[in-house]
Amino acid sequence: MAQGAWPAIWMLAEEERYGPYPKNGEIDIMEHLNFEDKIYQTTHSYYTLNLKQTENPPHGATTPVKADDYNIYALSWYPDRLVFQLNGKETFVYPRLNGVDASQWPYDQPFYLIIDQQLGGNWVGPVDLDHLPVEMAIDWVKLYQ
């Protein structure tokens, strides 16, 4: 952990089926900021970012985490919902809604996984050089279909 550290496990669509970002969606399985004791689990799409529909349904949640420990982050992806988990416990569900703009559910196409450790940015603020180097330790990754 460090000021300006932004480790993340997230997903983007393999192709631009619906047009440029954010029309194909983004799934943030885990984002952690600085020294916070929580993670962010969020969905982004044209529906949430451009149409500002962040509460119908809620597009994300925060969950307490022990950031110095190993944690198991999971996403179970179903045709009608995304189910986020932390250490085997369900933390957030993003459902597919009927009767709303079609951009609410771009999650009907293949996505790829990104695991990265970003430094700095508008959300996390500047990097404190005294906190370098930073790391995100990963013990294992499991994908199944």
Regions found by a protein language model. Give the residues of each.
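GH16 jelly-roll
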Residues: 1-145
